[in-house]
């Protein structure tokens, strides 16, 4: 019964962005996988729903220039296990220090390094805005801004708790 109530509340309030199947789309996270920027515990999911999240990836075009964007794109794609031009990727790796503050020195993201913001893991080949060379270049060149709205004042804590439990259950079907 609780699962069905959670599903109904999810469909009414969350499906517009995350999809009726909770698999997300470009710019909206998949809630069924295990790729979570802030953690996938029931408490963290509830906190995200209650208070929302704001994420920002800065634009690097001015700092890197066209050549630097191309090099950094190659390195980021190499981190994800893709075939790239090694010379470009090596040059990108030399510049990766400016990215390490958020993504960690190994590119595994803020969650892997207990950092307080939601910088994604660049090594898992999961891409919120697309993993094509063009999409990665656009992210580096222009940056990204993501907003998850706060639902505490809209739905109240009880309904948020039920939706949180539903999301946790669909993202952890083995538990």
Residue ranges of predicted features:
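Generic C-terminal helix-cap and adjacent flexible tail
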Residues: 169-175
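Sequence/structural segment immediately N-terminal to covalent heme-attachment motifs in c-type
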Residues: 2-20, 47, 84-113, 137-142, ...
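Extracytoplasmic electron-transfer domains, predominantly the class I c-type cytochrome c fold
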Residues: 26, 32-81, 115-169
């Amino acid at each position: 019964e609780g699962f069905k109530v959670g599903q109904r509340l999810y469909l009414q309030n969350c499906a517009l962005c995350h999809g009726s199947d909770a698999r997300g789309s470009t710019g909206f996270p998949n809630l069924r996988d295990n790729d979570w920027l802030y953690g996938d515990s029931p408490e963290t999911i509830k906190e995200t729903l209650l208070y929302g999240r704001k994420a920002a990836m800065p634009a690097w075009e001015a700092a890197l220039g066209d050549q630097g964007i191309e090099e950094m794109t190659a390195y980021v794609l190499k981190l994800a296990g893709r075939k790239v031009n090694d010379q470009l990727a090596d040059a990108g790796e030399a510049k990766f220090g400016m990215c390490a503050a958020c993504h960690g020195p190994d590119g595994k993201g803020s969650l892997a390094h207990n950092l307080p913001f939601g910088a994604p893991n660049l090594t898992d080949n999961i891409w919120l805005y697309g993993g094509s060379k063009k999409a990665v270049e656009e992210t580096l060149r222009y940056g990204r801004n993501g907003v998850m709205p706060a639902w505490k004042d809209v739905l109240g804590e009880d309904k948020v708790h039920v939706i949180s439990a539903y999301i946790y259950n669909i993202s952890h079907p083995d538990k």
